[in-house]
Curated annotation (Swiss-Prot):
<protein>
    <recommendedName>
        <fullName>23S rRNA (uracil(747)-C(5))-methyltransferase RlmC</fullName>
        <ecNumber>2.1.1.189</ecNumber>
    </recommendedName>
</protein>
<dbReference type="InterPro" id="IPR030390">
    <property type="entry name" value="MeTrfase_TrmA_AS"/>
</dbReference>
<dbReference type="GO" id="GO:0051539">
    <property type="term" value="F:4 iron, 4 sulfur cluster binding"/>
</dbReference>
<dbReference type="InterPro" id="IPR010280">
    <property type="entry name" value="U5_MeTrfase_fam"/>
</dbReference>
<comment type="function">
    <text>Catalyzes the formation of 5-methyl-uridine at position 747 (m5U747) in 23S rRNA.</text>
</comment>
<feature type="binding site">
    <location>
        <position position="307"/>
    </location>
    <ligand>
        <name>S-adenosyl-L-methionine</name>
    </ligand>
</feature>
<keyword id="KW-0698">rRNA processing</keyword>
<keyword id="KW-0808">Transferase</keyword>
<dbReference type="GO" id="GO:0005506">
    <property type="term" value="F:iron ion binding"/>
</dbReference>
<feature type="binding site">
    <location>
        <position position="87"/>
    </location>
    <ligand>
        <name>[4Fe-4S] cluster</name>
    </ligand>
</feature>
<keyword id="KW-0408">Iron</keyword>
<keyword id="KW-0479">Metal-binding</keyword>
<feature type="binding site">
    <location>
        <position position="3"/>
    </location>
    <ligand>
        <name>[4Fe-4S] cluster</name>
    </ligand>
</feature>
<keyword id="KW-0004">4Fe-4S</keyword>
<dbReference type="GO" id="GO:0070041">
    <property type="term" value="F:rRNA (uridine-C5-)-methyltransferase activity"/>
</dbReference>
<keyword id="KW-0489">Methyltransferase</keyword>
<feature type="binding site">
    <location>
        <position position="262"/>
    </location>
    <ligand>
        <name>S-adenosyl-L-methionine</name>
    </ligand>
</feature>
Amino acid sequence: MQCARSSAGDCHSCGWLSLAYSEQINQKQHNLLDLLPKNYAFTQLAPVESQQVKFRNKAKMVVSGSVEKPILGLRKPEGEGVDLCQCPLYPASFEPVFPILKTFIAKAGLVPYNVERRRGELKFILLTESRHNHSMMLRFVLRSEKKLAQLRQALPWLQAQLPQLAVISVNIQPVHMAILEGEQEIVLTEKTFLDEYFNEIPLHIRPKGFFQTNPDVAASLYATAGHWVKELQINRLWDLFCGSGGFGLHCAQKNTELTGIEISPEAIECARLSANELGLEHVEFQALDSTGFALAKESVPELVLVNPPRRGIGETLCDYLNSMKPRFILYSSCNAQTMAKDIQQLSHYRIDRVQLFDMFPHTAHYEVLTLLVLQQS
C-alpha cells in the first residue's frame, strides 16, 4: 500500500507499512504462537487475511484549522493539523463526503476546537458506513451545546447534499483531554441506528456502540465462531462482553439457550433487536457487568464465550471459570498477550484450536479466536 502521508512522516498510524503484507502476517502469527503454551499440541489454523486498502467502515477525524478552512484528519504533537481525507484505508464512498462536511462546518459556524487556546467547539467528526446498504452515520463531537441550534438550522442543507446520512448525532465532550467522546449523545435524525448484516445475521450500529472497523474480516471471525460452536452440539451458552451480540447470534441455533451480557445498555438494545428479527425465542440479553453476572451464578452452561476488552477477562473471572468448569470456553481477543495470561490461569483447560484474524493490517495488532476444552481429570 502506498500512502503519501506516511511517506512524508505526517501519519504514523500504519507502523508496519514498510513490511510486505505476507511478512506482516508471518510476524503476527509468530507473535501469537510465541505467547501460547508449548507443552502440548493444538490445531493452528491458517490466518484470515484482510484487504490491504479500503477495508475500514469508519473514519475518526480530528477537526483543526479554521471554521472557513477546516482540516479533517489528525493533529501532530506540535499542534499542526494533517488532512487525512485521502487515507487509503477508507472506502471510496467516503471521498466525496469529506468536502461537503468541510463546507457544512463553515455554513453551521462550527469553530474547530483549538487545544492550545482551549477555544472552539468542534473536536471530532466520526463517519461510519453500513456495507449492507451503504447508508452512513455521522457524529459531531462538540465541546458544549453552544452551537447546537446553529447545527440544527443548517442540517437540512447537509441532508440534501448527502441523503445517505441515515443517522446524524451530536456528542458532547466538555473535557480538555484526548477523549474521543462524552456521555451525552443527542440524535438529530428519526433513525437512531445503522442496519448491518454479517452472514445473514442482522446487526445494528448505534452512535455510542462498539462495532468492528474491518467488516469483511469481522464477518469471517463471527462465521468461524459459529461454525466451531455448531460442531460442539451444545444447548446452552453465555456470551460475556457480548457487545451488540455478533458472536452469540452467530452461535445460537433455534433452540439454543443464549444469555448475552454487556455493560452498555445501547449495545444490549441492539442485540435484543437482532434476536427479535431472527425469531430466536430462547435468547436473553442483559446490560450488566460480565464478571459480576457470572460470579452470581451457581452453575454454568456447556460453553462460555468471552470477547473482553484489551485487558482480558481478568483473574477473578478466570478463577471462577476454572472452578465451575464449563466444558468449553471460546475466547475472542484483540490482545493476545492478555489472552495468553488468562489461558495460563485457566489451568483446567487446554487449547483445542486457534486462528488469527488480521483485523488491523499494517499494524502489529490482530484478533485471535481460541477454543479451550476442559481437560478430563
